[in-house]
C-alpha cells in the first residue's frame, strides 16, 4: 500500500506539470512603465508683495501672456487615436528541372552474349517541378480618444506621456493604454494631439471577460494540440 502511494505522487506531479504547461499564458503588455505621474510639489511660496495685481503662484506659476499648454510633469494631454494601416504581400515561385542520362556498353565478351543480350543499354531521365504561391493582407483601423499624463520632460523639451482608460461593462472589462513622446508644438490650442504625430507610440487594447474566454482554447484542447504530431 505504501509503495502504491509513493508511485502515485510522481504521476500526480507530472500531470499537474502538464496541466500547468497547457495553461493559458497571458500576452505580454505592449505599454510598460508608469501610466501616470503626479505633479511635483510646488516650491514654498514667498511672501507676496503688497500692491501687486498678478501673482504667478495663484495661477499655477504660468506667465500672464502664455497659454496653458502642457509642459510639466503631471499635466494632461488628450490623444486623438487615428491609426489606420494597410499591408499586402504576395509571392509566387515556379521552378522546374529536367535531366537525362544514357548508359551503354559498346562491346562485351562473346561468351556473355546470351546472358546480357543488350541489357546493359540503359536510359535514365528525370524531372522536377515545383510551384508555390502565397498572399497575405491586413487592414486595421483604430479610432477614439484617450487622455494621458505627462510623466517626464526630456532635455530638448519633448514630453513623455502615458495613460490608461478602463471600461467595465456587465461582466467584461476593456482597457486602452497609450504611451509615447510628444513635441509640445504639435499640441493644439484645445490640448489635443493626433496619435500619428506621437513618436515611439505604444497602443494597447485588451479585453477581459466572457467574450475573451470564449475565444480562448481550453487547456485540454491545447494539451492534445501540443502532443499531437500532426
Curated annotation (Swiss-Prot):
It is found in: Cell outer membrane; Bacterial flagellum basal body. The keyword Manganese does not apply. GO terms for cellular component: bacterial-type flagellum basal body, distal rod, L ring; cell outer membrane. Keywords: Bacterial flagellum, Cell outer membrane, Lipoprotein, Membrane, Palmitate, Signal. The keyword Membrane applies. It is a lipid-anchor. A lipid is attached at residue 22 (N-palmitoyl cysteine). Residues 34-53 are annotated as: Disordered. Residues 1-21 form the signal peptide. InterPro entries: Flag_Lring (IPR000527). GO terms for molecular function: cytoskeletal motor activity. GO terms for biological process: bacterial-type flagellum-dependent cell motility. A lipid is attached at residue 22 (S-diacylglycerol cysteine). Its main location: membrane. Belongs to the FlgH family. Assembles around the rod to form the L-ring and probably protects the motor/basal body from shearing forces during rotation. The basal body constitutes a major portion of the flagellar organelle and consists of four rings (L,P,S, and M) mounted on a central rod. This is Flagellar L-ring protein. It comes from Bordetella bronchiseptica (strain ATCC BAA-588 / NCTC 13252 / RB50) (Alcaligenes bronchisepticus). The lineage of its organism: Bacteria, Pseudomonadati, Pseudomonadota, Betaproteobacteria, Burkholderiales. The gene is flgH.
